[in-house]
Amino acid sequence: MDNLYKIQQKEIGFFRFRSGQTIASIGAQCCHWEAAYAADSVIFYLEDIDSSKFKKGQIEFAWNYYAILRGRPMTSSYKMIVGDERSTSLPENTFDKILIINSFHEFSFQAEMLADIKKKLKAGGILYIDEALPKREGQLHGICNLPMLTNEETIAIFEKNGFEYVNGIDFNYRQKVPVRKIFAFRIK
């Protein structure tokens, strides 16, 4: 797992977390990515809609595990929030950054959720979308069996809903074309 933490440094650098920031992760469920990304003195709001799998014990396990990998205690804190398919239940005008990791393609009500998310970001805040990319159009996700979004489809959905694409980082994992991407958007 030390190697995984080293690989994640590329992602951590892209997110540019800073001490004192307030970050939300929507669709957080097991919270292991958020724990890996936890910079010093960041406040995390961890949100999910499935309270049967979104458990404090899982978060505590992940937080402790990554503290061991980091070689020092976590100084970030977290709050658990249960939302629903149309609303995050997060506080408004609060977040420097919002993450959606490998779950945006699962949203049943994408437009409603993006409208809700726009209210949650502070002025100048960034929304990060981390998704696997299909090798071909119409490909289904290997875990949830839902359609994956192409790079172009993802950007189009966000632009249609009042966001602009700022930047992105591709992950090829020894493939010829990217198989995963983190997109960065801000409100237009």
What are these regions (language model features)?
Residues 24-88:
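Class I SAM-dependent methyltransferase SAM/SAH-binding core
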Residues 22, 43, 124-126:
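Short glycine-centered segments of the SAM/dcSAM-binding site in methyltransferase folds
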Residues 95-110:
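A short SAM/SAH-binding and catalytic strip from SAM-dependent methyltransferases
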Residues 2-21:
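Conserved alpha-helix/loop element of class I SAM-dependent methyltransferases that forms part
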Residues 184-188:
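C-terminal lobe and adjacent flexible extensions of AdoMet/dcAdoMet transferase-like proteins
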Residues 111-126:
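A short glycine-rich, Lys/Arg-flanked "PGG" loop and its adjoining helix->strand segment in the class I
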Residues 125-183:
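C-terminal alpha-helical "lid/dimerization" subdomain adjacent to the S-adenosyl-L-methionine
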Residues 86-98:
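A short acidic, Gly/Pro-enriched loop at the edge of an enzyme's catalytic core
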